[in-house]
């Protein structure tokens, strides 16, 4: 492979907030009914373990302030009615409601249901284990192969008190991780009765909200890394989502890629759809369209739309980057799906009625199915934000763009000041403001609208890789060592 090609490949530094899976432990348990499978998958093992039978749980009503998975409901990143402060000061405690130290390393984001906040972490037996933030081209794996404890924590979101913590898995990592990543980069998901954590090749683990293990599933090895240099193991970051009674996971690996839906209460496979894909890091999205529910995944060979009930492919779109990380988002009948690796680096805006192969013809930027597109403008890590009629695109190098959602017209392009180590966390929006979190730990508050206006910059004092969560007037920021609750003191 040419040196230039290798250099372009290793520029990927997986650090999503994010964001995958269980190792061979001789797990027991049989499925009560065969899963639907759209095509034969090779020998990948899927093994389910269920502890002593626990009662079935009815799905709760959506609790106030819920932020159930990566970037909240439908990955929108938006929560209105928050009345958040524009400024806070960690050192002086101004507008800091609480902070709680979480051991270990993780880029996973907090998720919230009611008064419960869940986070994950991987705690190394080597207290010096770390990761390296920043804008650089190294594609090396970390030398941290020490014994880990993969943890799930439940906190009281009002006080920050740790209510329970569980060791989901303990052992030496099956795969390596990128020097910028952690062994817990996938964000958990919850529906108010179950919280699901995915730890790559270590497994998928489901607890009830009281900390009882409900089930765990071995999906086999989740080998995610450079598509053209297999020895570059970077680790997963795609996060689980819960839709109705399904836990949906996107498993794009060096071989045998697939999307799978598990029963949320039992872990049984409901459907599994194989696909020819390169490794990817984006989280899938399920939204309600005019034609019903649709599951959309971002990946290298094709961006795809599926029926989330069955896993049947509805449409596909070629032309994406060889490395994909941002999550699809949806608003006003339009999907925004993007990726930043050059030379493609596209932003695609797909109409909700897309069917079949909707790949654009050479030289075309729109079609019946594609409202508009742009090449070499996509973000590398952060997921775009659709907010109040505009699409905001934050790249890891600090370039911040705004486009008209309906037309694709560029509203502005702004280089953020003092970008430092760059950006991995995705923007979130509330009450006409946008919150941008840098790897150096600065959260900038930007006015939403057609003119770029920076209101404030707030230093968290720590590296920040995870996307914040918003709930009932509080911004929850997960830094390298702590979870912070930021809000107006009453």
Placement of each model-derived feature along the sequence:
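Noncatalytic, solvent-exposed loop/strand surfaces
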Residues: 2-17, 22-490
């Amino acid at each position: 492979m040419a040196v230039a090609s290798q250099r372009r490949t290793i520029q990927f530094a997986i650090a999503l907030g994010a964001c995958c899976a269980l190792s061979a432990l001789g797990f027991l348990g049989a499925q009560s009914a065969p899963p639907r499978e759209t095509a034969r998958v090779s020998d990948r093992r899927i093994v389910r373990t269920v502890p002593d039978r626990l009662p079935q749980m009815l799905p709760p009503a959506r609790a106030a302030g819920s932020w159930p998975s990566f970037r909240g409901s439908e990955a929108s990143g938006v929560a209105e009615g928050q009345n958040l402060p524009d400024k806070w000061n960690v050192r002086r405690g101004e507008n800091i409601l609480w902070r709680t130290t979480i051991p270990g390393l993780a880029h996973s984001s907090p998720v919230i249901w009611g008064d419960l906040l869940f986070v994950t972490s991987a705690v190394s037996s080597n207290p010096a284990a770390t990761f390296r933030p920043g804008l650089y081209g190294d594609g090396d794996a970390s030398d941290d192969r020490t014994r880990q404890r993969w943890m799930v924590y439940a906190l009281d979101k009002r006080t920050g008190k740790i209510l329970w913590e569980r060791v989901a898995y303990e052992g030496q990592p099956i795969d390596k991780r990128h020097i910028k990543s952690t062994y817990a980069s996938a964000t958990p998901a919850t529906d108010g009765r179950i919280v699901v954590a995915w730890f790559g090749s270590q497994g998928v683990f489901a607890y009830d909200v009281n900390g009882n293990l409900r089930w765990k599933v071995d999906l086999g090895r989740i080998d995610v890394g450079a598509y053209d240099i297999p020895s570059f193991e970077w680790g997963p970051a795609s996060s689980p989502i819960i839709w109705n009674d399904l836990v949906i996971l996107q498993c794009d690996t060096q071989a045998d890629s697939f999307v799978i839906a598990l029963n949320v209460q039992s872990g049984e496979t409901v459907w599994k759809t194989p696909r020819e894909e390169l490794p990817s890091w984006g989280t899938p999205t399920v939204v309600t369209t005019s034609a019903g529910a649709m599951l959309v995944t971002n990946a290298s060979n094709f961006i795809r739309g599926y029926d989330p009930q069955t896993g049947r492919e509805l449409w596909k779109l070629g032309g994406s980057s060889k490395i994909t990380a941002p999550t699809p988002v949806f608003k006003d009948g339009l999907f925004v799906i993007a990726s930043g690796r050059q030379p493609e680096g596209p932003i695609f805006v797909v109409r909700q009625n897309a069917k079949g192969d909707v790949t654009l013809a050479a030289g075309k930027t729109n079609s019946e199915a594609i409202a508009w597109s742009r090449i070499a403008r996509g973000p590398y890590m952060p997921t775009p934000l659709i907010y109040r009629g505009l699409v905001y695109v934050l790249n890891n190098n600090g370039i911040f763009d705004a486009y008209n959602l309906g037309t694709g017209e560029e509203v502005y392009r702004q280089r953020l000041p003092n970008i430092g180590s760059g950006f991995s966390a995705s923007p979130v929006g509330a009450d006409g403001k946008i919150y941008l979190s840098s790897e150096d730990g600065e959260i900038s508050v930007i006015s939403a609208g057609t003119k770029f206006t920076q209101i404030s910059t707030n230093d968290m004092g720590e590296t920040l890789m995870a996307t914040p969560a918003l709930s009932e007037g509080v911004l929850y920021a997960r830094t390298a060592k702590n979870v912070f609750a930021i809000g107006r003191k009453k």
